[in-house]
């Protein structure tokens, strides 16, 4: 079995080389028809577009993307060509929740926002959105949920309309997949009409897909004061991001909200397990991220501990200083562990 692997997928080499007869590692953007022609499987990230132009005439039978999102896979073509694909749902949900929690603490510190007096609207309540809701409730924030597919499927009254969330929420955070058309279209879900309906002074966060928010409409909302702040981890036209938007946001990061080592290890494990199931391979391997240098966090408050473990301002400062290095900052991301890797002692 021959497998082509994105060379930025961590913790995979030892395991995949036990499984496959031949493994080739390549940058995600450099996957070509010639490279994949005689491969049996691909293990990719979002930078590899898997469609007819890449796959036609190849031997590829299986694709695993080590990501939650799968809009870079032409699923209709894969179905037509008999290619099985899989993603890694929920792999980095705790990582995104960590990013949101730290960002909320930054807003509290720097903007005087009293979190226990705020209402947050969570748009998209899957694996990630559910974790974010848990974090918000733990911090004493009132939570409103919007998820039209779930609302219709479950016939539940727990969900609010997007209009209601826009009008009532102090903070709105997006955790939806990208659908460019259809009943549940999310492309430019936050457009000028959405921003004009917002509660004045609201904060917008996006860690889902850049195209969920219309950039020019977001910029106008920031210029006019409709929004007080924005936190943007995903951008339209990545890696060629809008520099005015980067300058205006309080936190702007290079698509790394889900990039904890724990989340990456989960994604790699899920991709390998799916590969082994498809090819009916039995193997025994463990994928664990490196330990942090200092596992003991001793500080006066939980807020301080959270920001000691992960402070997104470091990533934001790096991108704002070097916006042309978007892909490099993302590809060479330093070790970041989640809270469970530490022992936290609150001294106050």
UniProtKB/Swiss-Prot annotation:
- Give the residues annotated as active site: 209, 238, 255 (proton donor)
Protein's GO biological process: pyridoxine biosynthetic process
Q: What is its EC number?
A: 1.1.1.290
Q: Which cellular component, as a GO term, is one annotated location?
A: cytosol
Instruction: Please indicate which superkingdom the organism of origin belongs to.
Output: Bacteria
Keyword check for Cytoplasm:
yes
**Subunit field text:** Homodimer.
Which protein is depicted?
A: Erythronate-4-phosphate dehydrogenase
